[in-house]
């Protein structure tokens, strides 16, 4: 496991030395930009760091971090930025415990999650304290509110327990700050209410949902885009031609009868067939 840093988890006067490790790795196929040459070679495109004022390419060593303030540019040195981070504290400080359901789940929309691993260099006490914190969170059904500074930003998160075969792993789930979550004003229609829903539709919709309800199995879902992208890359590398397919947009629902028919048809169609990869062999 690759650690992103060693840090102290502090709860009151209790300190648990831990390592923060990422929980995921991307399986996306990332494209790079190339310049095709007539001789069949490809030159990788590199982005120069251009100064928009003088137009010159600027070496990384000559680049400073600045912030706009009242129409001016304020430059902060690396030492100044480091001192700000140090002043706000790098420890995972837990000032409060709350019930998980009290937190708006939308605050986790852009979350990063880090697992906390007891630092093996700090002995048995670190490990037993780790287990004690885990026990309290699980037994009292609480999460800890966490505030810490990392990578040049003060961050808010929750200390939670990820279920696992060995009793659970402590995790930090980053949250947005309250003022970073956009308002819901203007999203929900105000020209109609639930009283305007046709009474024939609700029981049929409920049946559709019931027919699609089951136990959660994350392995049942795969990244179809990445799978087909990989197949297309392999096919083209072998000389096959990739057929282009126009995207399909859903047909508009004209009236209640049309919607009712679609809902009833949905009950009969519980498991849609997997689409075949859109490609064909290159013809001579």
Swiss-Prot record:
Keywords: DNA end degradation evasion by virus, DNA-binding, Host-virus interaction, Inhibition of host innate immune response by virus, Viral genome circularization, Viral immunoevasion, Virus entry into host cell. One of its GO terms (biological process) is symbiont entry into host cell. SUPFAM superfamilies: SPOC domain-like. GO terms for molecular function: double-stranded DNA binding. Residues 10-189 form the Ku domain. SMART domains: Ku78. InterPro entries: Ku70/Ku80_beta-barrel_dom, Prok_Ku, SPOC-like_C_dom_sf. Required for replication of viruses with short cos ends (4 bases). Stimulates dsDNA end-joining by host LigD. Binds dsDNA with either blunt, 5'- or 3-overhangs, protecting it from host exonuclease degradation. This is Protein Ku. It comes from Mycobacterium phage Corndog (Mycobacteriophage Corndog).
